[in-house]
């Protein structure tokens, strides 16, 4: 029987999370993509703590964006998460795409974070 899109995404997500682990030296940059918005968190898995977060729901981004569900919004979130991470002294991260394919909005966020100074 063919898998649904949700089942495929959940399987990819479990597979990726089994391999990607954040540490204090290289925390995990986790991306969650919904139909309306995109969210990014830098997480230290050893302490189960979110160090930095950014999303299209934040007032400074939401007012300047036409939509939270396009590549332009993802680029802005990528830049913002990189700036906040660098302020906290985090330069190296492990990228966790979740169950999403590395394409489109997820790739745009990753590329913007790299350009803004994060190393992964």
Swiss-Prot record:
GO terms for biological process: translation. This is one of the proteins that bind and probably mediate the attachment of the 5S RNA into the large ribosomal subunit, where it forms part of the central protuberance. Residues 1-22 are annotated as: Disordered. NCBIfam families: L18_bact. One of its GO terms (molecular function) is structural constituent of ribosome. InterPro entries: Ribosomal_uL18_bac-type, Ribosomal_uL18_bac/euk. Keywords: Ribonucleoprotein, Ribosomal protein, RNA-binding, rRNA-binding. Transmembrane segments: none annotated. This is Large ribosomal subunit protein uL18. It comes from Nostoc punctiforme (strain ATCC 29133 / PCC 73102). GO terms for cellular component: cytosolic large ribosomal subunit. Belongs to the universal ribosomal protein uL18 family. Residues 8-18 have a biased composition (Basic residues). Part of the 50S ribosomal subunit; part of the 5S rRNA/L5/L18/L25 subcomplex. Contacts the 5S and 23S rRNAs. HAMAP family: Ribosomal_uL18_B.
């Amino acid at each position: 029987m063919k898998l649904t899109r949700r089942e495929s995404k959940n399987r990819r997500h479990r597979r990726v999370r089994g391999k990607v682990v954040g540490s204090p030296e290289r925390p995990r940059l986790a991306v969650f993509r919904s139909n309306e918005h995109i969210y990014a968190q830098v997480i230290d898995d050893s302490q189960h703590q979110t160090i930095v977060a950014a999303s299209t729901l934040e007032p400074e981004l939401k007012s300047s964006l036409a939509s939270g569900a396009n590549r332009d919004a993802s680029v802005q979130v990528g830049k913002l998460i990189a700036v906040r991470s660098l302020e906290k002294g985090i330069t190296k991260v492990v990228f966790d795409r979740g169950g999403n394919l590395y394409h489109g909005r997820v790739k745009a966020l990753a590329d913007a974070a790299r350009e803004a100074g994060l190393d992964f």
